[in-house]
């Protein structure tokens, strides 16, 4: 048997803020989930994403502590166009989420930006640049 990636799990400090952020990115998160300690949503292709509060993680791993220093996890969202990268970046930063890299035309042929989620983790927004289309 070959293992297969089935779920991406995120540990969050504020469930409602995290779910609101990822809803803005188009994830279909249940509307009544904001006060739940564990939430899952289906992703295209059968993959799942899950959010757990810090308390949930500590309930089965009492030694768990939040990471310090640089965050090593990043999620990347493919946008339909370079204009959508710019618009989504403006929407998220306008809603108070910190921008890490303003939209720019990356040398690898993408319009690319990074905004931080409520726990300070980078979320990339990208689309093939107009020249690469």
Q: For the regions a protein language model found, what residue spans apply to each?
A:
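Generic secondary-structure boundary/loop-capping signal
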Residues: 22, 104-105
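Active-site/ligand-binding-proximal alpha/beta "capping" segment
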Residues: 98-104
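Minor-groove-contacting beta-hairpin "wing" of winged helix-turn-helix DNA-binding domains
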Residues: 38-41
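Glyoxalase I/VOC metalloenzyme domain signal
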Residues: 1-6, 11-33, 43-98, 116-133
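Short, small/polar residue-rich loop motifs at catalytic or cofactor-binding pockets
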Residues: 107-110
